[in-house]
Amino acid sequence: MTISTDRPAPVSSWRTYRRLLAFAKPYRLLLVAALIAALIEAAGTTGFLALMKPITDETFIYKNAEVSRWLPVQIILLFVVRGVAGYITDMAMGKSARSIARDLRIKVMAKYLRLPGSRFDSEPVPSMLIRLGSDSDQVAQAAVDAVKVMIQQSLQVIGALALMLWHSWQVTLTILVLAPVLAWVMDKVARRYRRISHSIQESGAQLLQAADQTLSSHQEVKIYGAQQTEMERYGALANRNLRLAMKVESTRGISTATVQMIGAIGLSALLFVAGAQALAGRLTAGDFVVLMTSMLTIIPGLKQLTNVQNMVQRGLASAERLFSVLDSPDEPDQGTVPLTRAKGLIEFRDVTARYPGQVNPALADVSFVAQPGTVTAIVGRSGSGKSSLIKLIPRFYEAEAGQILLDGHPVQAYALADLRRQIALVGQQVMLFDGSIADNVAFGEMRNADAGQLERAILGANAMEFVAQLPEGLQSHVGTKGGRLSGGQRQRLAIARAMLKDAPVLILDEATAALDNESERLVQDALHKLMPDRTTLVIAHRLSTIEHADQVLVMDQGRIVERGTHHQLLAQGGLYSHLHGMQFRERQA
């Protein structure tokens, strides 16, 4: 099944926003408190504007000493109340926004772990990190931070307009004629922001992916002198990101200038009409100051409401990217057959498998039986389908045709968790997590293993000889991806993990291919302790390591072209004999 990671199909902004607001429901009490506080804050702003009339008329025109004494106290009280309300609004909205970002990250991370393996082939990990990182933050900003700005500024604009209507409805209605023009500008700005936001987020993911590839392969980059090439490639992506960012700045600048121009026209209209009203004796100096300061409050409020469109549209674009993950189908998991501990009988019946977007199948009509307690070796040239075959057993991928059976039942008949509980995997590239040795061996469902079980597994894997020399023993940290340990040490910890799991099916994917002779000897010895009484499938690069396998499957171009024991295949003089002869000559050279 092909999984696309292209830009999500556009949906209505309101539909996306409504779905996004569902994540705010657990924090509705906080949001209600923030709304009430925002109303008080807006009332404080409106109250201060209303004081402009007595300040002007009573203090400067009528010289009223009594009013002049209590006005400063009122102003201080207003701003104290307004400041407290603003603090409550910021804290309540901030807590809600950060909580929504956390909830989204956890939900999307959990979803990624339920997606089929093909998703991880079609979407690079840096893109996933962008979704879990900046996308989640921008969604939180759209869901709450933008709402905070819109509520605060809208209430202040409404309060200022109400005050203007109270003092002179004629002047106010003259200014409101400009409202349709302003609404048109804000709509255009919102549409442009949304278009650019999709592109800039995709550009950010490409930048992160390019950096990840270059830095992860820094040794190859240096040894082949590719620094200039990689910097040119990264620079081109960075320049594209810059161009998109400048489009955002250009849109913001033009929209701000347009809103300010509309505000200037409104201010000019106010001066003209208010002057006429004053000449007719219908406006006092205090009324004019109230109208003027209210208008000067409205203009920056409108500017912020226009600029917040960028935050909203980027958040909505991020929300669509996150929802595209959340809406992706999980791994199929409809199995109902109970499975406590399998016997380990594995059978492939005419299995064909194909990767998404590939014309040629990775596997074609593959059939074999692995009896319980036996060792099945799988060999062949690079790209012959060996790894594809073993990935089908734990259902990391699904077969296109044919059946894979465990103990006589199709693997789809079992629940995924039950099926995977029967399998231990030791690969060439061992993944250790940033934690202690004990945490990495007693991993996942084995985390409650007792100290005796853990020690026996480490001893059996020939790992105790280096673990005992570490300052903190089992509690020693292995570093990111096990970076503090050698390849052989990591491999032995992976074997210890498999020993502790004690699964009836063991998969070894070229477990000794990249090791030196001494490390290989220790790992091979540990594997020989691990393999008895299990159904073992071994992908082998070094054919000398599988001479005692119960059966050897030789693969080429996705098909099993030879099968038999080591000695039978050598006697046939086919592909296996050819590969064995090549390795023998290499060792002799």
Swiss-Prot record:
One of its GO terms (molecular function) is ABC-type oligopeptide transporter activity. Coiled coil: none annotated. One of its GO terms (cellular component) is plasma membrane. It catalyses: ATP + H2O + lipid A-core oligosaccharideSide 1 = ADP + phosphate + lipid A-core oligosaccharideSide 2. Its EC number is 7.5.2.6. Its main location: membrane. Gene3D superfamilies: ABC transporter type 1, transmembrane domain, P-loop containing nucleotide triphosphate hydrolases. The keyword Transmembrane helix applies. It is a multi-pass membrane protein. It is found in: Cell inner membrane. Keywords: ATP-binding, Cell inner membrane, Cell membrane, Lipid transport, Membrane, Nucleotide-binding, Translocase, Transmembrane, Transmembrane helix, Transport. It holds the Pfam family ABC_tran. PROSITE patterns: ABC_TM1F (PS50929), ABC_TRANSPORTER_1 (PS00211), ABC_TRANSPORTER_2 (PS50893), MSBA (PS51239). Residues 32-314 form the ABC transmembrane type-1 domain. The chain crosses the membrane at residues 29-49, 70-90, 157-177, 261-281, 283-303. It comes from the Bacteria. Residues 346-582 form the ABC transporter domain. ATP binds at residues 380-387. Belongs to the ABC transporter superfamily. Lipid exporter (TC 3.A.1.106) family. Involved in lipopolysaccharide (LPS) biosynthesis. Translocates lipid A-core from the inner to the outer leaflet of the inner membrane. Transmembrane domains (TMD) form a pore in the inner membrane and the ATP-binding domain (NBD) is responsible for energy generation. Homodimer. In MsbA the ATP-binding domain (NBD) and the transmembrane domain (TMD) are fused. This is ATP-dependent lipid A-core flippase. It comes from Xanthomonas euvesicatoria pv. vesicatoria (strain 85-10). The lineage of its organism: Bacteria, Pseudomonadati, Pseudomonadota, Gammaproteobacteria, Lysobacterales.
